[in-house]
Amino acid sequence: EQSSVYRQLVARLGEDRVLLAAKPSDAPADQWARASTVVFVCGSTSERSYDSEFDDNGAAKAVTEYGATCGEGVDLSDIRLPWSQDDMLGEVAALTTAPIVSVAVCGRAHVLTDVLERSAVTIWAGYAGQYGPQAVADVLVDGADMSGRLPVTLPAYPAAIPVRYNDRQSAAHVYKDAAEPILRGFGYGAGSLAAVTFSEMHADTQSHPGEVLVQVTAHADDHGAAGAVNLFAHVSGGRRIPRLAMLVDSVYMDLNAGERRDIAFHVPCDRLRDVGDGQVQVTCTLDGDSTHTVTATLPGEY
């Protein structure tokens, strides 16, 4: 049987406490007024029908109405949420004073500016597979941790693209009417690691030939935590304009309550410079957070 966020919520709360509405007019005004929480599931789809026609390149053609909005052969000139979902959310917000929790089920980066502005909480579910609805309900009802990180860069405006975390030039202040075109950056979201503190970060280029060893101490609070910590690097020097940031390593950790643990990142030098670059300076940050930064110098005999 197919699962959905609605079915998972019904299984936990009971059918009498969960009302399903495909559009705002499906529920009477008094029901919207009585709601304690509104869960707005939005996003896109890559679903193809079994009788799809295929293009010359072998990709299934998307149907015009409610067909695939992402996937192979589905390039879009407008990456706002399809099917007027922003307008629908505006109608919902006008009908209720209850907090809105938006769940974005997306297979590509969409402009979620209106969604974030109108929602008390926004959960990026991506394409989470058959257990995705269960995971969302675990968060909404059971208070499960959200340990994931945003796997894409979300643009703030439909025309201020492309935006990529590892570009060589910043997208900020390129457009006069969109000073900050990035809504949420790649890797955004501390999730279940929000209460973890880091200290004693340092880099070692000597003990492991051919790689940079970055070490940091993690300290969990009274509840413990589990999730991935990402290490980003920015390289100065060399023959090319450097990328603003590169994801160079990721370490999953599972900390007990009150536990302190040393975490080690191993970054091959080949990922940080090209042949003939000479001496370069590498600045590493945890999850792009400038408060946790360390700098190392790679010698020039490469």
Q: How does the language model describe each region?
A:
Residues E1-Y302:
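C-terminal non-catalytic regions of proteins with extracellular/luminal or membrane-system context
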